[in-house]
Amino acid sequence: MGQKKKKLAKGRLDKFYYMAKEQGYRSRAAFKLIQLNKKYNFLGTAKACLDLCAAPGGWMQVASKYMPVQSLIVGVDLVPIRQVRNCIGLTEDITTQKCRTEIKKALKTWKVDVCLHDGAPNMGTSWVQDAYQQAELTLHALKLATEFLTTGGWFVTKVFRGSDYNSLIWVFNKLFKKVESTKPPSSRNASAEIFVVCQGFLNPKRIDPKLLDPKFVFKEIQEVKKVDVLSEKKKVNRAGYEDGVTVLYKKGFISDFVNSNEHLQDLANFNAFEFDEAAKIFEQHELTTPEIKELVKDLKVLNKNDFQKIIKWKKAMAAYKEKLDNPDEEETEKPEEKKELTAEEMEENLQEEMKEYLALVEKKKRKEKKRQNELKRKHQRKIELTMHIPGDKIEETTDGDLYSMKGKDEFDEDIVADHSDISSDEFDSDDSDDDDDDDNNGDSKLIDDDEYLEQQLDEQYKLYQQRIRKKAAKLDDVKVKKDKIGQDGYNEDDEEFVEEQEESNPLLVGNKRKEPDAQAVSSLFFDNELFGGVEYRNPGDSESEPEQDGDDDQDDENNKPIDISKLKKQKPQAAQPITKKQKTTNSAEFGKQKSKYQKNPTLDDKDDQDDDDDKGNSIKGFEEVPVQEEVEYESDSDEDIDDKIKTKALGEFLIRKKSRQDLIDDSFNKYAFNDTGLPNWFTDDENRHNKAQTPLTKEMVDEIRRKIKEIDDRPIKKIAEAKARKKYRLGKKMEKTRDKASSIVDNPEMSNREKSKAIEKLYSGTDKKNMKPKKIIMIAKKSKTAGGGTGKYKIVDKRMKKDLRAQKNKLKTVGRSKDSSKKSKPSGGKNKK
């Protein structure tokens, strides 16, 4: 049978434990009260609350959060409670009169609307005693609640399921209108606790003291048996001695006891056994020990174990006697004689054994190979799903290996062997680190064991950062490609086609051409023949270079591929000074692109900056001048809108003195720490997760978002003026058209048909040829072919679009030449009437 698993402490660290840590609650029990309040909503309208057995203060935090502002909250416990905002903590015993006095001082003339109780006694004795102490503590809490609860108040308490549970429910029903038992989801299933919510305190003028007395409430009720007068009396049959027995002490013989099949009855009837002449063979047997001889002398004083020994000895003696009585029937086992094998048979046996052994070895190899392939497949799957980071593995070592520097090289080799599927960049970084370690091998022996472990953690964290940096670089490449597609004139459908083409098969990494980084592009750019005669200047030269103003453009060019053929065709030009207008234009464009691509800085920005500083400030003779920080222009992204909402809400908090002081007080919290010497991986994780909660409600955020939307939807002044002018011109035109139409209607010389045609032509404004709808030209997708159609849209490719544009321009020039020739000819012909 397997051993029973021992319950460990880490098994109790469930999701509510970590949620309490993240949200700043002092215990996971806070979520029990949150879920109870969500179901019954007793904290939303409460103005005063009394929390009994409140340590460490988790329920007080929840009450302060969900109760109205300026509510009175008092917490009582035997253990001192750390200060909770807007709460009063008392260190008293709820069973004493002193506790009642202190609560009255804290409440003054108030009556509480809600009384909470989440206390439990010291557990660890028997379950019956623990359950009784919990029920008794709940009754004391109820007694205290009846003194301070207002009419219609709530009482929420924790109760253990047990024999006293029904008694407590009976008492609750006497004092409250409605009593319900529930178990919130945050309460562990293994726990026997349940929560009783009592609603509508009756507040009677006089409460019977017996209702709150544990001795009376938990007293066991004994049912009184009813006396049956008509019951018949049963006559007891008394058993006497056996007939003809004159002596009560009986002795038996061992020979009869061994031969008897009813030995249990003999042990009950006889007081002792004697060894007679027939039992000499049993007395001399090796199993007949002095203990057996003493046991059979007095059978009435033996216990169960002694009787078992006698019965076991009796069976052994019976088998021994049967063996002596039938000696001829014993079959002697004779070993079989081994046949001598010939040389051929031995050779065949050897061949068969070899085949079996080879088959077994081959089977083990196949099994091991299958296991290795399965492990590799799982490992690769984890890497693809970003569930596992290469190099992020804790090696299991013994205590001797952990605290010694022996075998460090073998340990590093094992790490490299385990992570054979790491990319080439990671191998290069690992090799460089190993070379540095080999150079300083003599100094490494002096390193402390703790420092060695910290170095190992730092190396693992570097691999993790490289992984994040590569993912961020891929996202930047996708953004740059989108911009290139937009500059070439593609529409939104083409952008979606490019994204689908790139994301269709992310595993085919080898087929994609890697984009050149900034250093490779700059080296390729400066190796051109155009810069053959340029003289380089040192940073210390006093003369200023006009090219320094163009560094911003150079940074932008690093993100774009350079066409070498165009550079060769260009002629070298003399350096010209850049005007002030060009400087402002360049800086504005750089600021826009910077706000677009660096709006969300990653954790690796700081590391990239440090790496750039270590590399130096020159590339092949050219000095890299640090770019001044540009102002990031605002964008309409969701993150900027959230920042606006947060800023506006904090500004509203700063208007009033009380809210401003509360905001300043909240800034002094557990998140404000300034410890030095912490590792990078710890500080990065703290900065990402360990943040204080902003005091914003959902209603406040919705209201601010609505105001910002109203401001954004408001048109600018120029657009409003243009719309007004357009509306004014349209009104004037319609008024003029109405006047003309009325004059046509009043004309008596025109027939009704002529009038209708004239009015129709007047309102149409132009003839039907100009009113013919034009076809909208669309560029075909790469997945579609260009072709004609009779619908609203005409699908063309780039070449057809350019041809159509050229054809239209040619027709325009032909029309202009015809018009000029017509104007040169003298007018003639008949005039139309």
UniProtKB/Swiss-Prot annotation:
Catalytic activity: a ribonucleotide in rRNA + S-adenosyl-L-methionine = a 2'-O-methylribonucleotide in rRNA + S-adenosyl-L-homocysteine + H(+)
Gene name of the record: fsjC
Record's keyword terms, sorted: Coiled coil, Methyltransferase, Nucleus, Ribosome biogenesis, rRNA processing, S-adenosyl-L-methionine, Transferase
Biased composition (Basic residues): 363-381
Name of this protein: pre-rRNA 2'-O-ribose RNA methyltransferase
Residues at which S-adenosyl-L-methionine binds: G57, W59, D77, D93, D118
Keyword Plastid: no
Biased composition (Acidic residues): 423-441, 490-503, 542-556, 605-614, 626-640
GO CC list: nucleolus; nucleus; preribosome, large subunit precursor
Top-level EC class: transferase
